[in-house]
Swiss-Prot record:
It comes from Latilactobacillus sakei subsp. sakei (strain 23K) (Lactobacillus sakei subsp. sakei). This is Large ribosomal subunit protein bL32. The keyword Ribonucleoprotein applies. Keywords: Ribonucleoprotein, Ribosomal protein. Signal peptide: none annotated. Belongs to the bacterial ribosomal protein bL32 family. HAMAP family: Ribosomal_bL32. It comes from the Bacteria. SUPFAM superfamilies: Zn-binding ribosomal proteins.
Length: 60
């Protein structure tokens, strides 16, 4: 079984793990609905770029 020849230092370990992170979603304020939504996505009420593109279903 392979064994590392040298111990990995804290710096090298942290540099390697520096790319492992959670990205925050790009959230913007939607002036049409007055709510926040993720960029380049249709809002929950069916608006995209100020136009209604999808008619939302009624929640019963």
């Amino acid at each position: 079984m392979a064994v590392p020849a040298r111990r990995t230092s804290k710096t090298k370990k942290r540099m390697r793990r520096g790319h492992i992170k959670l990205n925050t979603p790009n959230v913007q304020f939607d002036a049409t609905n007055g709510e926040y939504r993720v960029s380049h996505r249709v809002s929950p009420k069916g608006f995209y770029k100020g136009e209604q593109v999808v008619t939302p279903k009624a929640n019963d």
